[in-house]
Amino acid sequence: MKRPAYMSEVPVNHTSGQEARCVYLTFDDGPNPFCTPQILDVLAEHRVPATFFAIGSYVKDHPELIRRLVAEGHDVANHTMTHPDLATCDPKDVKREIDEAHQAIVSACPQALVRHLRAPYGVWTEDVLSASVRAGLGAVHWSADPRDWSCPGVDVIVDEVLAAARPGAIVLLHDGCPPDEVEQCSLAGLRDQTLIALSRIIPALHSRGFEIRSLP
């Protein structure tokens, strides 16, 4: 199936001369009171930054987690207010989803510099891209997706990420779950596989000569 022309505006990786050996860890669907602190602990242990694509409704519930991740050197990005499929939304609703999430983030942590947007489910449309540009946000997709949300096993998550690791790779992981899976979001062990895999992925990337950064 041919990729729509407008999708060329959504980067799936990031490379530049100065960041030729960088890999970017990103986390969607948080903040979550069980998972996000554990993810932050692993990142702190290995002294690497990441970018967290936060859902605005969760940010309002757990502003302290946004303040913590910013204080620890991570970036917060926009993952909309309620995580809808934006392809089913009219342009006004798309704008509202992005604007309300942005306001929730900066209200939780005025120091947060929100520079990126990731569409829920990775579903991009021309309306979404236009709204992203008007909001001053760079659209970001991914190049490495181990589908950790499906709990495929720690080895699968690690192997998929390492197989896709190359200069500029953007890795998609999760520190929560969408609001329509709210019952799972209350499970303390929701992202245990992601957590264990992350503790293996980071040193493995370093051993391959990659530097891990948050999105530029």
Curated annotation (Swiss-Prot):
> Looking at the keywords, is Hydrolase present?
yes
Lineage top rank: taxon: Bacteria
Coiled coil (UniProt feature): none
GO biological process assignments = carbohydrate metabolic process
Q: Which GO terms describe its cellular component?
A: cytoplasm; membrane
What is the documented function of this protein? Is involved in generating a small heat-stable compound (Nod), an acylated oligomer of N-acetylglucosamine, that stimulates mitosis in various plant protoplasts.
Indicate what this protein is called per its UniProt record.
Chitooligosaccharide deacetylase
Instruction: Specify the taxonomic lineage.
Output: Bacteria, Pseudomonadati, Pseudomonadota, Alphaproteobacteria, Hyphomicrobiales
Q: Which gene encodes it?
A: nodB
